[in-house]
């Protein structure tokens, strides 16, 4: 067994620097002068096992082979590991004799990942040659947010510059860019039409208040009611007879007394409560006819 391991160890030594030749002349010269560490027990065992597994699975990656070899090494017992441990000790003793001044110096990492490179998307997910297009796309999309809702893009632009992720070129289409803009003209509510009709109806009722305030200034709440119902100036109502004015004034007092607590007026509230519900509907009819001027000719 030891003879087999010695042949496996001695034979691949000239092939150890083949991978470094492709790195360049300077790297190859440095690798030849560099003294390698002695192999441990796992490396002695995995050298032959790795070759077998690579022949059985030619498409398997080297990292996957290393994972499987590590799992298999843990499953071995101490008796099975003993010959490889002894061989590792022998190689270490030979290494110390050949290189007495050897000191382990780990290699420095040549490339240090920046924060921007660490959180950026990998280039394999994008189409080749799309990096040059992505910069223009990201700048164009950041400009879409500049005057949105009337606010300038001061702090948000800085954040976008720091977090400028590469995006797909299809995001530059005009349909998608229009989605980032708000159209304030389309935010008109349909409730405005109903509000205008409500205000127009209120103006017809408020047009009667000047005529009533000229007749009687002692009516309760007429001043406040006229101030609440102030709207657009409307055309003055036609002349109304004294009979219709008294009827409308009485109905108007009944409507006001409906919302007042009992005891505030000298009138009989028990009689008013019975006539309130009956007088509300004729009030609108008489008010509408008085304002629109559709009274019979006999009353004029």
From Swiss-Prot:
Major localization class: nucleus
Compartments, as annotated in UniProt: Nucleus
Keyword presence, Transcription regulation: yes
Highest taxon of source: Eukaryota
Record's compositionally biased regions (Polar residues): 13-30
DNA-binding region listed in the record: 35-103
GO function terms (MF aspect): DNA-binding transcription activator activity, RNA polymerase II-specific; RNA polymerase II cis-regulatory region sequence-specific DNA binding
GO CC annotation: nucleus
Modified sites of kind Phosphoserine: 235
Entry's Gene Ontology BP terms: brain development; central nervous system development; negative regulation of transcription by RNA polymerase II; neuron differentiation; otic placode development; otic placode formation; ovarian follicle development; peripheral nervous system development
Stored CDD domains: HMG-box_SoxB (cd01388)
Motif (9aaTAD): 251-262
Entry keywords, A to Z: Activator, Developmental protein, DNA-binding, Nucleus, Phosphoprotein, Transcription, Transcription regulation
Positions of the UniProt region annotated as Disordered: 1-35
PANTHER family for the chain: SOX TRANSCRIPTION FACTOR, TRANSCRIPTION FACTOR SOX-3
Annotated function: Transcriptional activator.
UniProt-recorded name of the protein: Transcription factor Sox-3
Organism: Danio rerio (Zebrafish)
Lineage: Eukaryota, Metazoa, Chordata, Craniata, Vertebrata
């Amino acid at each position: 067994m030891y003879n087999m391991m010695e042949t496996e160890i001695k034979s691949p030594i000239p092939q150890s620097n083949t991978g470094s030749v492709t790195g360049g002349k300077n790297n190859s010269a440095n690798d030849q002068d560099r003294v390698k560490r002695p192999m441990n027990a796992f490396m002695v065992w995995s050298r032959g096992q790795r070759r077998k597994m690579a022949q059985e699975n030619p498409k398997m990656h080297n990292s996957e082979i290393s994972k499987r070899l590590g799992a298999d090494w843990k499953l071995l017992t101490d008796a099975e590991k003993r010959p490889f441990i002894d061989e590792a000790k022998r190689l270490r003793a030979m290494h110390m004799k050949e290189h007495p001044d050897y000191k382990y110096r780990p290699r420095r990492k040549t490339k240090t990942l920046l924060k921007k490179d660490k959180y950026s998307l990998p280039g394999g997910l994008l189409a080749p040659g799309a990096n040059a297009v992505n910069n223009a796309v990201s700048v164009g999309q950041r400009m879409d947010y500049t005057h949105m809702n009337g606010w300038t893009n001061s702090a948000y632009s800085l954040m976008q510059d720091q977090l400028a992720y590469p995006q797909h070129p299809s995001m530059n289409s005009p349909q998608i860019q229009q989605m980032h803009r708000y159209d304030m003209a389309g935010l008109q509510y349909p409730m405005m039409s109903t509000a205008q009709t409500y205000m127009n109806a209120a103006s017809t009722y408020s047009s009667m208040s000047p005529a009533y305030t000229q007749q009687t200034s002692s009516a309760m709440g007429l001043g406040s009611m006229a101030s609440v119902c102030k709207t657009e100036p409307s055309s003055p109502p036609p002349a109304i007879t004294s009979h219709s004015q008294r009827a409308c004034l009485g109905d108007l007092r009944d409507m006001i007394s409906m919302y007042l607590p009992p005891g505030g007026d000298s009138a009989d509230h028990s009689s008013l409560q019975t006539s309130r519900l009956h007088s509300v509907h004729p009030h609108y009819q008489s008010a509408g006819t008085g304002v629109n001027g559709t009274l019979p000719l006999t009353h004029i």
